[in-house]
Structure formats: C-alpha cells, structure tokens
From Swiss-Prot:
The lineage of its organism: Bacteria, Bacillati, Bacillota, Bacilli, Lactobacillales. Pfam families: OSCP. F(1)F(0) ATP synthase produces ATP from ADP in the presence of a proton or sodium gradient. F-type ATPases consist of two structural domains, F(1) containing the extramembraneous catalytic core and F(0) containing the membrane proton channel, linked together by a central stalk and a peripheral stalk. During catalysis, ATP synthesis in the catalytic domain of F(1) is coupled via a rotary mechanism of the central stalk subunits to proton translocation. The keyword Ion transport applies. It comes from the Bacteria. The gene is atpH. This is ATP synthase subunit delta. InterPro entries: ATP_synth_OSCP/delta_N_sf, ATPase_OSCP/d_CS, ATPase_OSCP/dsu. It is found in: Cell membrane. One of its GO terms (molecular function) is proton-transporting ATP synthase activity, rotational mechanism. Keywords: ATP synthesis, Cell membrane, CF(1), Hydrogen ion transport, Ion transport, Membrane, Transport. Belongs to the ATPase delta chain family. It is a peripheral membrane protein. GO terms for cellular component: plasma membrane; proton-transporting ATP synthase complex.
Length: 180
C-alpha cells in the first residue's frame, strides 16, 4: 500500500530532523532546506525532472550532483537518500514537515497577519515580536495577507489561534450590542 503525501512527508521529514539533530546540524539543515524550498518553488521543473520515471538513476544522479554543489555534506546525503527512494515528488512536503519540527523544537511560531493595507517590514516584525513575547515563543514568522474587507486593524492567525483586532470585527460587536 502506498503512503499518502502527508505520511511520506511526516516519515521522511522526521528522519531528516533526527539525522540533523544527531549530527548537531539542525540549524544548518533548516537554513539549507529553506533555501532549497525557495529554489524549487521558483523552478518546479527541477522536482519534475528528478521524479520522472523515464530517466534512469544514473541520469538523475548526475543532475542532482550538479545542483547540490554548495550545500553541506549532510544535505547532499539527504538529497541522495531521497533520490534513491524516489521521493523527490514529495520534496516540498518533506521540507515543510522538517520546518514544522524545527519550529516546534525551537519554540518558533508561524502565522498570518491579515491587514487592510500592507504594513512595512518593521511593523510586521514588531507585531511578531509582541505576539511571541506574550505567548512564550522564541520567535514568530508572520506572512502578511492584505484583506481590505477588514477595514483596519489586524487579524492574527497563529498556530490555530485567531486574534481578531480588525475594525470590521469591532463594528460587528457594536452592532450586536445595539440590536440586543
């Protein structure tokens, strides 16, 4: 029975995290995998080629060798391992799971800040720092999503928790109080 994408990502992501932890390279692996993920998302054909069943293992290995130059020996070993088990079609999911494990181990949160207008990086960072401090996180990585419907303020969605500080939400609360 074939594994689901989620189960494959969980198993391989966990194995890579354990390997990095045992070699004392979790931070380096995090950094390199994040860089690799960005590159793969910018050029998805890379994964398609290395997942192509028409190419033989030798051709795939030579392509991978050309790409993995500049990465650590540990990441090269991981990439060769994934290639040998034909798991390159799950590469981004596996990286995402590794990042999830890394963030959990280091008390780093991730989330989305919905705003009516795009904030500058400094504002977003201050918001992230404030939330991280309040909820006992070492750091918080926030992505911004612009949603003019909220009128003003911010809606934070972090690790399953939603804090709605939008003007729209406040107006809805006032409307509800007035209609009682």
């Amino acid at each position: 029975m074939a594994l689901s994408r989620e189960e494959t990502a969980r198993r391989y992501g966990t194995a890579i995290f354990d390997f990095a932890k045992d070699s004392g390279k979790t931070e380096l692996m995090y950094s390199e995998l994040t860089e690799l993920k960005k590159a793969v998302q910018a050029e998805p054909r890379f994964v398609q080629v290395l997942s192509n069943p028409v190419l033989d293992a030798k051709q795939k290995k030579s392509l991978l060798t050309a790409v993995e130059q500049g990465f650590s020996a540990e990441l090269q070993e991981v990439l060769n391992f994934l290639l040998s088990y034909d798991r390159f079609d799950n590469l981004v999911d596996i990286i995402d799971y590794y990042i999830h494990l890394y963030n959990a181990a280091n008390h780093i949160g991730t989330g989305v800040a919905k705003t009516a207008l795009k904030p500058d990086e400094d504002q977003l960072q201050r918001l992230a720092d404030s939330y991280a401090k309040k909820y006992g996180l070492q750091a918080l990585h926030l992505e911004n999503e612009v949603d003019p419907e909220i009128i003003g303020g911010v809606v934070l969605e972090v690790e399953g928790r939603v804090i709605d500080g939008s003007v729209k939400h406040r107006l809805e609360k006032i409307r509800a109080m007035l209609t009682k």
